[in-house]
Curated annotation (Swiss-Prot):
Span of domain TIR: 204-336
Annotated NAD(+) binding sites: 213-214, 243
Lineage, uppermost ranks: Archaea, Methanobacteriati, Methanobacteriota, Methanomada group, Methanobacteria
Catalytic residues (UniProt): 279
A single BP term in Gene Ontology: signal transduction
Organism: Methanobrevibacter olleyae
Annotated domain remarks: The TIR domain mediates NAD(+) hydrolase (NADase) activity. Self-association of TIR domains is required for NADase activity.
Its EC number(s): 3.2.2.-, 3.2.2.6
Name by which UniProt lists this protein: Probable 2' cyclic ADP-D-ribose synthase TcpO
């Protein structure tokens, strides 16, 4: 919760500085900021209310006049709501000067920019300096030590966005993510957290969701799943759940949300499959903060894993090169029993 609050405050500070001219900026940051605002994402699509109507001295004075962090957050949040709600744009200000198409174009490009800043997409549209620019931008005070969910690998993040459909759906997803951030800060998702923690363990339908490549079924996964079941664990396993005519994406998403833990079996084939990439992205969104991702390296070492994907967070993993199936399951049972006790 604390890292989200820090991130959100820094993100708001960033939005304010993008919308104004902060006279205290370092020379280096002024250069990067100008480059950001002139980059293809936002070029010619920044609404007048950002470029012209917000003089920094008035904007910051207004923020200070309204009050502290909570009021400032509410103000910016309402601004986002208005951007998303095109029907009320005409009431955004008394002069009714905002153009719906202009704001829609800006919003679309700003979302693309946020996605790229939040991922490892270091080079785009021939902008050779983008790699240096992005690294500089993300290491400035706004995003230093930012939460892990923003350090996502682009192939997972972008695949997830693409899987949800077009611009309208993508905009809705991003809007929902902002709502989640704000609800977390308000504490609505953390009320009586310690009391609800153990209750949630018993509410889920499955103990474990098994994410794996179908290529690994015969030499490891089937035996692994059968032994889990023999130990009395309920397991979400695609061969048991997904039948002909089922929507695979919906079944996977439901399975992840209905499980207490996720076992991810990393292998060479795992990184080649679009479905395992989809699972992987959703698993880390749902489970990482609660330390409920249980990784297994199948015929891989940590060094091998980094070659495939250097963005995977540092979590203790068990390797099939070092442990038998029985030993791996013993470790998993200990981890689950530790949580329940």
């Amino acid at each position: 919760m604390e890292d989200l609050e820090i991130f959100l405050k820094r993100f708001e500070d960033l939005l304010i500085d993008l919308a104004t001219y902060n006279e205290n900026e370092s020379n280096d940051y002024i250069i990067y900021r100008k480059k950001l605002l002139s980059y293809d994402y936002l070029k010619d699509f920044i609404p007048d209310f950002i470029i012209k109507n917000r003089k920094p001295q008035f904007f910051r004075a207004y923020m200070q006049e309204i009050g502290g962090y909570k009021e400032r957050r509410d103000l910016i949040y309402k601004g986002f709501e208005r951007l998303y709600d095109y029907e009320t744009i005409k009431n955004f200000d008394s002069d009714n000067s905002y153009n719906v198409n202009q704001i829609e174009n800006f919003l679309e490009r700003f979302e693309d920019l946020l996605i790229d800043l939040a991922t490892e997409n270091l080079k785009k549209d021939g902008f050779e300096e983008y790699s240096l620019f992005r690294k500089k931008f993300l290491t400035c005070n706004y995003f230093k030590d930012m939460p892990i969910f923003l350090k996502r690998n682009p192939k997972h993040f972008r695949y997830y966005m693409q899987s949800q459909g077009g611009y309208k759906e993508r905009r809705k997803i991003i809007s929902e993510e902002f709502n989640k951030l704000f609800s977390i800060i308000e504490g609505s998702n953390f009320n009586s957290d310690s009391n609800n923690k153990n209750k949630s363990i018993n509410k889920k339908e499955y103990d474990i969701f098994v994410s794996h490549s179908s290529e690994d079924k015969e030499d490891f996964v089937k035996e692994f799943v059968n032994l889990l079941k023999q130990k009395g664990l309920s397991v979400w396993y695609d061969d048991d759940i997904v039948k002909i005519g089922h929507n695979l994406r919906k079944r996977i998403s439901k399975g992840i949300k209905s499980s207490n833990y996720a076992v991810v079996i990393f292998s060479e084939d795992f990184f080649k499959s679009k479905w395992t990439n989809y699972e992987y992205d959703n698993i880390f969104l749902d489970f990482y903060d609660e330390e409920k991702v249980l990784p297994i390296l199948h015929d891989l070492t940590i060094e091998d894993l980094e070659k495939f994907d250097g963005s995977i967070p540092l979590i203790r993993a068990l390797s099939t090169k070092k442990f038998t199936v029985e030993e791996i399951i013993h470790e998993i049972l200990e981890r689950i029993n530790e949580e329940k006790s």
